[in-house]
A protein has these predicted regions:
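Short, low-complexity, Lys/Arg-enriched N-terminal segments of secretory-pathway carbohydrate enzymes
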Residues: 2-3
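Early transmembrane hairpin module of multi-pass membrane proteins
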Residues: 7-8, 12-182, 187-201, 224-307
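Active-site rim beta-loop-alpha module in soluble metabolic enzymes
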Residues: 205-224
């Protein structure tokens, strides 16, 4: 009798494990595919940058940026290939987030007019992700070299990112198509890039104007202050900007420490952009999962929309 009970318990346990695998196992495999490619690409990019950092580049032969002479950042300028290591390596946090966005743009494309544009068209997610990758690589290059070219590449990434936030909000407000969005995006970013080459000192003001304009559009679009993701992203960005000011004014400054205010600014800004992306995804009806049942066998999970 005890053996029969034990055998029944084992069968019941195996049945429940089968149900759990059918319910969560395939979902886990799908999520693993989503993160595997970005993780592999991130490892390749970091390995390439580590290899570059082992080489001795003569940065002094390049035209140096104004930040080198004015000592804008708190971190001590070191000799070698990486002049500001903590500010440089903290910039790489933008890269995995951008790669994840670009990968998700391919996997999560759902053709439904009820969803937000960033879910209906993969070009939005791709452009958002690529701008973050360029921001990370450009910021690393700038803090590693402190050269004029490095500053230019760094600001290009900032304009790509700020231009996307501004143009995406404007396209949703005006109900533009994806093609019109790309045209407006190019009309916003290209003049800023050309202006940056001739007037590099105005970059922070132009980038600040883009961010403030994007925030104003989001608040006026559908009262985004009621959305928790938007509020947390806004608070995170504000905290990062406050720490950046303290670092620049040397009020929060330890030159030889691993704790750098500008590095914290990089991390908080990357978190704010990730929250902004999740906020964009939260627009429209939620996409949920359910298990299909057919002929005594659990089938692949299907999507359905629920407000």
């Amino acid at each position: 009798m005890k053996r029969k009970r034990l055998r029944f318990r084992r069968i019941r346990k195996g049945f429940y494990l089968t149900l759990l695998f059918e319910k969560y196992g395939k979902w886990f495999i799908w999520e693993l595919k989503r993160f595997f490619v970005p993780l592999a690409l991130f490892i390749v990019i970091v390995s390439a940058l580590v290899f570059i950092s082992t080489k001795d580049f003569p940065w002094r032969e390049w035209k140096l940026s104004q930040g080198f002479y004015r000592d804008v950042f708190c971190e001590k300028i070191r000799s070698g290939s990486i002049r500001q290591p903590f500010n440089a390596w903290s910039s790489l946090i933008f890269i995995p987030i951008g790669l994840w966005m670009a990968r998700r743009a391919f996997l999560d494309k759902v053709p439904s007019p009820r969803l937000s544009p960033i879910r209906r068209h993969k070009r939005y997610g791709l452009l958002f992700g690529i701008s973050l990758v360029i921001t990370g690589v450009g910021s690393w290059f700038f803090h590693a070299s402190l050269t004029y070219v490095g500053h230019f590449v760094d600001v290009i990434g900032m304009y790509f990112l700020g231009g996307f936030l501004f143009t995406y909000g404007l396209s949703r407000k005006l109900r533009q198509s994806a093609t019109a969005f790309l045209a407006v995006y190019a009309a916003v970013v290209v003049p800023l890039v050309l202006f940056q080459w001739f007037n590099p000192e105005a970059s922070r003001y132009a980038f600040g104007a883009l961010i403030l304009s994007a925030l104003g559009i989001e608040i006026g679009l559908h009262k985004s202050l009621s959305n928790k993701l938007f509020v947390v992203a806004l608070l995170t960005l504000g905290l990062g900007f406050f720490i950046w000011i303290l670092d620049e004014k040397k009020l929060l400054c330890w030159p030889q420490s691993c704790l750098q205010g500008h590095a914290i600014w990089h991390i908080l800004t990357a978190i704010a952009t990730q929250l902004s992306y999740l906020y964009y995804l939260s627009e429209g009806p939620r996409v949920n999962w359910k298990i299909g049942y057919r002929a005594g066998k659990y089938t692949w999970m299907n999507r359905y929309w629920k407000r």
